Amino acid sequence: MNFGLRLIFLVLTLKGVKCEVQLVESGGGLVKPGGSLKLSCAASGFAFSSYDMSWVRQTPEKRLEWVAYISSGGGSTYYPDTVKGRFTISRDNAKNTLYLQMSSLKSEDTAMYYCAR
C-alpha cells in the first residue's frame, strides 16, 4: 500500500514538471526620449487564452509599478494615468503572446518590464 502511494506521488510530481509556467519577455532596448518600443511576452505551460494578463515594471529604485492590463479575450484594457495614451497592451491568443507597444517614451519609463499572469 505504501509503495503504491509513493508511485502515484512520483507520477504526479513528474507531470507537474511538464506543466511549468513560462513567460519570456523580449524586445527591450535603448531608446531616446520620444521614441517607441514594442515588447513581447511568449507564454507556455498554461492555457494562455483563459487568463487576464498584465505588464509590470521595476524602476531603477526597485519600485514595482503596474503599467497595463488586458482581459483574457482582449476586449478590456486598463492603464494607469502615467502611461495612458502612450502604452498599448494587446495579445494574440493563437500565438500565446502578449505585447506592449510603448510610444512617446520618457526618462521615467526607464525600468525592467515583466509580463504577469
Swiss-Prot record:
Region (Complementarity-determining-1) location: 50-54
SMART domains found in the cross-reference section: IGv
GO MF, one annotated term: antigen binding
Signal peptide: 1-19
GO cellular component terms listed in the entry, alphabetical order: extracellular region; immunoglobulin complex
Pfam families reported for this sequence: V-set (PF07686)
Annotated region (Framework-3), positions in chain: 86-117
Keyword set, alphabetical order: Adaptive immunity, Disulfide bond, Immunity, Immunoglobulin, Signal
Entry-linked InterPro entries: Ig-like_dom, Ig-like_dom_sf, Ig-like_fold, Ig_V-set, IgHV
GO biological process: immunoglobulin mediated immune response
SUPFAM superfamilies assigned to the protein according to its UniProt record, in alphabetical order: Immunoglobulin
Positions of the UniProt region annotated as Framework-1: 20-49
Disulfide bonds: 41-115
Stretches for region Framework-2: 55-68
Region listing for Complementarity-determining-2, in residue ranges: 69-85
Additional remark text: This sequence belongs to the VH7183 subfamily.
Protein name as it appears in the record: Ig heavy chain V region 345
Species this chain originates from: Mus musculus
